[in-house]
Regions:
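Solvent-exposed adhesion/ligand-recognition segments of exported proteins
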Residues: 2-6, 15, 20-273, 280
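Binding/recognition "hotspot" determinant
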Residues: 159-160, 164, 220-221, 282-680
């Protein structure tokens, strides 16, 4: 994208210099094609005596139309035009650096220059609608009655750029339209008419736009743009480029890109202070460290990719995003925030990825009351929610439900899918609630060793030991959560995996249905070791920081688990305040070996030169526990785990105990030292 921007950015200084040196010196110069004249004031301000009207439209043609800082007046006294058209017929671009004012009755103003229009400190007064365009002007004359005609204005655009310089563009307008092949905004564009029906609209790319000139210049209840068509020209250019110094502020803001493949890139601020922000393109839309804020709705749409990086997108009402792919990510200044006072709706024909950013619907007041609607994500492909190194990935509905539907997988990686209401996840593929884990040496399997050294008298120097390494968790403070406060958690998928994460409903049910396998597992990290060295004396030392993370499913009500092939709880905990029902051919309750260390380096043994230590191995987790009953529709297998219910445990196929939960010392071969025989 940046390569496409270079020609436009580099051309701006040349345009400014070229116009200021020659064409700007000429200012506003009629070409003689219309009855238009110009007079110059002592301050340098120019007055344009506009041509008589046809159907309420005054058409004026120029070889040069540039406005210096002294400004220019369009004299509408005695003409009473509703619309004043100013079109440049030469090859000179236009530069507007001052005020353009309508003398006399208020009028709509159109400036059309196919060679390009640059505004740097320009403003408009006593105007209704203002159109800046690089299109060619034509007219559509409509006979309303004998001798009565309405002349509509048509702008056909296929080239030229509108550039807003650092000085910006301002006015109190019914509406501002920017129509060009390309649009570059390097300064503030402000329409001070605060109304949800007035604003700023950009139509960028090849297009033909028709304006109904019958409307009064004071009528902000009707849109005078009655039609826009586009040939669908293919382009990979960045059609709209807004720099960090640029911005758009109005009652309503619309950016519409017509060319196929052309996109929008914004680092600036877009603010609709009374209505909506709408950005529609046929290429990629990229908002990086910029902001979109609307007092009503924000709508973003493209068949391409929408990427929000460190961006702030907020709406008082709804946020609606539709794209081929949607990607939210954080950067060094901070996370992307996509939030709405009511509902957030993201729809993708591809994938949706949220990395280290916040998607939130609704608000929570200081007194704890909540308002708002749902967070709804729908993707034909995968939905991925992950945390970054610095920021959590969060999807949160403050008052409604959080609902994710994917044609592929739903992956919640070290991130959080939350709701004060209900949570619903539906995937044609797998649902994974996981944390990042780097495996230890030997795959977490224990390793024992013995080393025999030199001898002294009848003593042999022997060292024996034991090590186990479960690896590390990248960020133990960023566990994966799927949680609902006042509603159920419902998950439907091909396979379900909760590895190191937490799934919970505070006061309702958790229901998980997997077409194939259900797996709930704690992730174990840390190392355990034991070393014993004997020669004349024996010295032993033990250590363990083995810790389980997550693997928790809990509900204030009932828990329902359905698996087509197998249900496994590996070192985790499944707990229900109500009942647990597992509908699967076979259900495994599997403990994972944890370790604790005991060291005795003082006392009687140490007095004689020896120290004592021990490693205790125990089964951790693998339990299904309910205050109500636990019901298995198939077989149950205990491998270091457990099934327990306050109202009993039943299994249609019976329960087989392969290994009951145990706690035993790890046995290491002992070797004789001088004092060992006293306490072996």
């Amino acid at each position: 994208m940046s390569m496409n921007l270079l020609p436009l950015q580099r051309s701006l200084p040349l345009v400014l210099v070229g116009v200021s040196c020659s064409a700007l010196a000429a200012g506003i110069v009629p070409d003689g094609g219309t009855v238009t004249s110009v007079s110059n004031g002592v301050t340098g301000r120019q007055t344009v005596n506009i041509a008589p009207t046809i159907g309420g439209v005054s058409n004026n043609t120029y070889s040069s139309f540039n406005v210096s800082k002294a400004g220019a007046d369009l004299n509408n006294f005695g003409i009473n035009a509703r619309t004043i058209v100013n079109q440049v017929t030469s090859t000179n671009p236009s530069l507007i650096q001052g005020n353009v004012n309508v003398l006399g009755p208020r009028a709509n103003v159109i400036l059309a220059n196919p060679n390009g229009v640059t505004v740097d400190g320009g403003s408009f007064t006593n105007t209704g609608h203002v159109v800046l365009s690089t299109g060619q002007v034509s007219f559509n004359d409509i006979a309303l009655a004998p001798g009565v005609m309405q002349r509509n204005v048509m702008l056909t655009t296929d080239r030229g750029a509108i550039t807003i310089g650092p000085g910006g563009l301002s006015g109190t307008l019914v509406n501002l339209d920017l129509i060009a092949k390309q649009l570059s905004i390097n300064g503030p564009v402000t329409n001070d008419f605060t109304s949800s029906t007035s604003g700023i609209r950009a139509i960028v790319g090849d297009s033909t736009s028709t304006f109904d000139t019958s409307f009064s210049p004071s009528d902000n209840g009707h849109d005078w743009l009655i039609g826009t068509s586009s040939p669908g020209t293919k382009s990979n250019a960045v059609a709209v480029d807004i720099t960090a110094a640029g911005g758009l502020t109005a009652g309503r803001v619309q950016l519409i890109v017509t060319d196929q493949g052309a996109g929008v890139h914004s680092l600036g601020k877009i603010y609709a202070n009374a209505g909506d922000v709408v950005v529609m393109a046929n290429g990629d839309i990229a908002i990086a460290d910029g902001s979109l804020k609307a007092e009503r709705d924000v709508a973003l749409g493209t068949p391409g990719t929408i990427s929000l990086q460190g961006a702030q997108v907020t709406a008082a009402n709804n946020v609606n995003v539709q794209a081929g792919n949607i990607a939210l990510s954080d950067d060094s200044p901070g996370p992307t925030t996509l939030s709405a006072g009511n509902t957030v709706n993201l729809t993708s024909s591809g994938s949706i990825t949220n990395t280290g950013s916040l998607i939130q619907a609704g608000t929570t007041a200081s007194d704890g009351t909540t308002t708002g609607g749902d967070v709804v994500l729908t993707a034909a492909g995968d939905i991925t929610n992950r945390s970054s190194a610095n920021n959590l990935g969060i999807m949160f509905a403050a008052n409604g439900q959080t609902k994710l539907t994917a044609g592929g997988n739903i992956i919640n990686d070290n991130a959080r899918i939350l709701s004060n209401g209900a949570v619903s996840l539906t995937a044609a593929g797998d649902v994974q609630n996981i944390i990042d884990h780097t495996g230890g040496t030997n795959g977490g399997q224990p390793t024992a060793y013995t080393d025999r050294g030199g001898s002294f008298l009848f003593f042999t120097h022997t060292t024996s030991g034991f090590n186990v390494d479960y690896g590390t968790v990248g960020n133990p403070d960023q566990l994966a959560y799927i949680a609902a406060v006042h509603g159920p958690v419902t998950i439907t998928s091909r396979n379900f995996t909760n590895a190191g994460g937490i799934v919970q409903s505070n006061d309702s049910e958790v229901n998980i249905a997997a077409q194939n396998a259900f797996t709930n597992a704690a992730v174990f990290t840390g190392q355990a070791s034991y070393t014993r060295s004997c020669w004349v004396f024996c010295h032993a030392d033990a250590s363990s920081n083995v810790t389980p993370y997550g693997g928790t499913i809990q509900a204030g009500g009932n828990i329902g688990i359905k698996a087509g092939t197998v249900a496994r709880n590996i070192g985790g905990y499944v707990f229900a305040n109500g009942d647990i029902k597992v509908d699967a051919p076979i259900t495994y309750a599997q403990g994972v070996t944890g370790y604790s260390a005991i060291n005795q380096h003082r006392g009687f043994k140490a007095f004689f030169g020896s120290t004592w230590a021990q490693i205790i191995a125990m089964d951790v987790g693998g339990g299904f526990s309910a205050n109500g009953g636990v019901t298995l529709t198939g077989d149950g297998v205990i491998e270091g785990g457990s099934f327990s219910g306050g109202k009993g445990v039943t299994a249609a196929g019976g329960i087989t105990t392969v290994r009951a939960p145990s706690r035993t010392p790890v046995q290491i071969d002992q070797h004789l030292g001088l004092t060992t025989w006293w306490w072996r």
